[in-house]
Amino acid sequence: MNPGNRDIIDLSMNEGEPPSRACLDVLERHGPALLRKYADPAPLEAAYAAYLGTAPANVLATTGADDAIDRVFRAFLAPGEEMVFPTPTFEMVPACARMSRGDLVPIEYEWGTLPHDDILDAVSERTGVVAVLTPDNPTGRAFSTDSLLRLAAALPPEVTLMADLAYAEFADEDPTRALLEVPRAIMIRTMSKSWGLAGLRVGFAVGAKERIDALRGYGGPYALTGPSIAIALDRLENGVDEMRGFVEYVRSRRERLAAVLREVGGVPEPSQTNFVLASFPDARWIQRGMAAQGVLVRYFAHLPEYVRITVPRDDAEFRRVERALGCLDRPEALLFDMDGVLADVRRSYREAIVRTCASFGVEAGHDLIDAVKAAGQANDDWAVTHGVLADAGVEASLEQVTARFEEVYQGTGDEPGLRRHETLIPSREVLAELARIFKLGVVTGRPRADAERFLREQRVRGLFSAVICREDAPLKPDPAPVRVALDRLEARTAWMLGDTPDDVRAAVGAGVVPVGVVPPGGGRTGWTALEEAGAARIVEADTDFGGLFHG
């Protein structure tokens, strides 16, 4: 889903605030020699050890935390041995264990309390590693240092305890120093989150010298680049206060984000990280609806009731998040495509395409028309008809095709046109109720005369404060007509209901929430096309229309 050219806020990856530009000065100081030489990680390991309050021999610099996790399993999880871990967890933990050909033993538990007894019950002579995240991803919960020490003390000496502490700076407790006293423990740290250096891929394994020495043999000798080491080292020497200021900002804003989520029907989990996990009745709607508005959040297929949202990094981002969530809960306006959403055009516009093609000797079935519409760039039925004829080898101008189409649709002389078969899909009562709550608008590719006539004939014209037609702006999928509708309605947030990928793409480009509508008689093909185009939700016009706004 691509929200046009608007700025996208990515709150799906838990990345930190970008560091100050001053950190780039180090590259200028080093010059091109930094790129020529193989990089020595020892100064970085010493600086990070000093930051943690331990010896350099207890620290191994790795290519991000993922590399550290991978090394732990390659070193301490033999093929066929078991990795015991509370679940859900960071996906790279089980992924790396599988790559080492280890067997997974997941432990379901009540989030927030370390399942000490369940973990110990699962440990056997085949156990190689017990893996724990604190604070946890994706739940955001943290385990107490005491509970970790109690678990470590109870594990057999040959079992390695891996504690992923990627979010430790954001938590109330940092168990690093306590776990450094546990010979079998290895901690995973990173500069991707609180330090804002995810692009450098700088991580660390921290533990007893004997364990760290073992890990050194399970990776390349130059795991980090010279620029990565130089910038990370500079941040450790000059950026600690900056990092801690950002951490305090996140801690102060977590509850604000949780409050916003509660206001729109979410149930947020307590968090000690830089993100909040929240459950919703329809989490997929939240994720896709926010993406359409240019705010990316994380949805988990294995946790289908939840979305995870990184704490916005400044007030401007917070306002975008609040507006996007508010729109999903209660938009200012509802924008309707006409054909297939308000008007049942199976026996009018769609049939006009069929009969116009037939008049040129070409058979065009409804399945073909559905496929053309689903492919996109098909909001102009005159152009669609001309394209079908051209594909069949008919040499006719667009003007000729349009004239024939209009004869069929409008009627000629004593021959009534197909437009007489058009009916209103939603009831007038439903539209009237919506008009009492929202500003309503129509965004259609129809000529104004046809659109206005249909609305008058169906006695609903007075319910729509804006009717945008082909004369007003470029046709969808261009977002321009949607933006014109927003301007005329004086609305900042809206849902756009449409039955084609062009409607969805126009909505996304304009920053409004696209709701796909499967028109009467539509099948699975239309549903799939709407979903692939980025519809945040899909409903069937003749069954779900009213319920969409009352669920």
Give the role of each language-model region:
Residues 111-171:
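Active-site phosphate-binding strand-loop segment of PLP-dependent enzymes
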